[in-house]
UniProtKB/Swiss-Prot annotation:
This is UPF0761 membrane protein CKO_03126. One of its GO terms (cellular component) is plasma membrane. Pfam families: Virul_fac_BrkB. HAMAP family: UPF0761 (MF_00672). Its main location: membrane. InterPro entries: UPF0761_bac, Virul_fac_BrkB. It is found in: Cell inner membrane. It is a multi-pass membrane protein. The chain crosses the membrane at residues 44-64, 104-124, 140-160, 183-203, 210-230, 244-264. It comes from Citrobacter koseri (strain ATCC BAA-895 / CDC 4225-83 / SGSC4696). Keywords: Cell inner membrane, Cell membrane, Membrane, Transmembrane, Transmembrane helix. Belongs to the UPF0761 family.
Length: 290
């Protein structure tokens, strides 16, 4: 009896085990951790230029002045765990210094920010193993659109949320609003990863695969934030060793961990489609033989 149950369980879990084996094989072949390290390095170099460009765009639109503060607080509170306040102070100092740069220096900041997007594009197309290339002008237009419209849309959504919260009728829905706001970072991460996996690759990505991969990445990202914050709180070895400089290795590790999650979601998205094709090919071969 137990043997039959065990055999049935193995039979039902065989597709899952085969998919996990394929996923591990792709992660190994694509050198996912190395790609994550490369992106982490480029991200750390581009972090200040990217933030400087984003908030310079907000400064160009006076109506977004209040939203800029809300967006800044939201980013550091929800995307950088535990040490967000310290990192925010340093980055704001760097951004303030960058505002004193000349036009040539400002162009350099924009180019550096665009290089990060190019690195992300290259890494994801490596995972999708797509050899198709977009025209340079088209790629630049897409990167520039993301760089300009992305922050403005995020700011607009925060402004709308603040307006709705200020309405009298909304005060009666405090419990519902609190619950929605509690899962809002997860939903925002899910949508962001879905757009990343759907738009950036130069090959067609099935929407359902992108949704699943983005959801896994979003859950891991939110869990990673809480786990990382808990680790820093419970095991403050970095503070003991590095002292006031502890924020530097903490930021390095967090950025690397974030890119590992992003690329893992991409690998899951790719593997879902590849496994489905392999399964269909095997079924077709069995049908031909019979």
């Amino acid at each position: 009896m137990l043997k039959n149950v065990h055999q049935k369980a193995r039979h039902h879990t065989r597709p899952v085990r085969a998919w996990l084996k394929l996923l591990w094989q792709r992660i190994d072949e694509d050198n996912m951790t190395t790609l994550a390290g490369n992106l982490a390095y480029v991200s750390l170099l581009s972090l200040v230029p990217l933030i400087a460009v984003v908030f310079a765009l907000f400064a160009a639109f006076p109506m977004f002045s209040d939203v800029s503060l809300q967006l800044r607080h939201f980013i550091f509170a929800n995307f950088i765990p535990a040490t967000g306040d310290v990192i925010q102070r340093y980055i704001e100092q760097f951004v303030a210094n960058s505002n004193k740069m000349t036009a040539v220096g400002a162009c350099g900041l924009i180019v550096t920010a665009l290089l990060l997007m190019y690195a992300i594009d290259s890494a994801l197309n490596t995972i999708w193993r797509s050899k198709r290339t977009r025209p340079k002008v088209y790629s630049f237009a897409v990167y520039w659109m993301i760089l300009t419209l992305g922050p403005l849309l995020a700011g607009a959504s925060l402004a709308i949320s603040s307006y709705l919260l200020s309405l009298r009728w909304a005060s009666e829905l405090n419990t519902v609003i609190d619950n929605v706001l509690r899962v809002f970072p997860l939903i925002l991460s899910w949508i962001s990863f879905w757009l990343l996996y759907s738009i950036v690759p130069t090959t067609r990505v099935p929407n359902r695969d992108a949704v699943v991969g983005a959801f896994v990445a979003a859950v891991l990202f939110e869990a990673g934030k809480k786990g990382f914050a808990l680790y820093i709180t419970m095991f403050p070895s970095y503070q003991l060793i590095y002292g006031v400089l502890a924020v530097i290795p903490i930021l390095f590790v967090w950025v690397y961990w974030t890119w590992c999650i992003v690329l893992l979601g991409a690998e899951i998205t790719v593997t879902l489609g590849e496994y489905r094709k392999l399964k269909q090919a095997a079924e077709q071969e069995e049908a031909d033989q019979s």
